Amino acid sequence: ETSRPLEAEEYERLKAALPEALEGCAAAVLSDYGKGVLLRRADGSCLAGDVIAACADRGIPVLADPKLDDWGRYAGAECVTPNSAEFAAVSGCAGETREGMEEAARALCRHIAVPRLLLTRGARGMALFEEDGDPLFIKAEARQVVDVSGAGDTVIAVLAACRACGLSYARAARCANAAAGMVVRKAGTSPVSREEFLYAVRRDGGSAPKIMDLPQLRELVACWRQ
């Protein structure tokens, strides 16, 4: 495994594949693991920017889970979703106060030309900062943390799915928080089922039923056992 930027042939092949890959796409995710595919090349070209430009031409929202320190690669995306360590490394803000986080997040968004940032804060939940509007701080959902593997991937996947359905970022962030709360209760990298997700979102919104019939109870218990 290497983490070098793409060679010219690799870059051109991936770039040429974008139009077909984006057919029927309602949202796009740049899940950057710092392995090289989304790195800026020596000539300044960058597949991340090409994806964002192609999506902009088609009206497709792009969300990025950032890595390393060159977040300018995500310029034009709708949102970046760093964790606390990634945010602190790039912004210089360790998150001691909400005011400090907001100031640092807004400055960072202006610098990288991205209108919003969803900060995942582990046991402290999430914080959504948008260029227009007040910050939104969301408490963590998990009562018991078993394994945090896959939580970040779950957050951006649910966030993108919600945006593809037309939800606001505030509502999408709450849905992502609910889903992440389900994931960290499971051992290993485990998915969230549709039933689990709907139950978590309804509970978060106060609409989860307190009285259920036997089939509903069986379905819920099956989710808990997974």
Descriptions of predicted regions:
Residues 111, 115, 141-203:
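Conserved post-catalytic alpha-helical subdomain immediately downstream of the catalytic base
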Residues 138:
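Hydrophobic residues at beta-strand termini and immediately following loops
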Residues 28-31, 83, 126, 153, ...:
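Conserved structural-core and active-site-/substrate-pathway-adjacent residues in large, well-folded domains
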Residues 209-225:
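Positively charged, low-complexity intrinsically disordered leader regions
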Residues 33-135:
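Conserved phosphate/ATP/ADP-binding segment of small-molecule kinases
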Residues 1-30, 190-211:
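Conserved N-terminal subdomain of the carbohydrate kinase-like
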Residues 11-12, 60-66, 214-215:
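Short gly/ser/thr-rich secondary-structure transition/capping motifs
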Residues 30-33, 226:
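Active-site donor-nucleotide binding/catalytic segment of nucleotide-sugar enzymes
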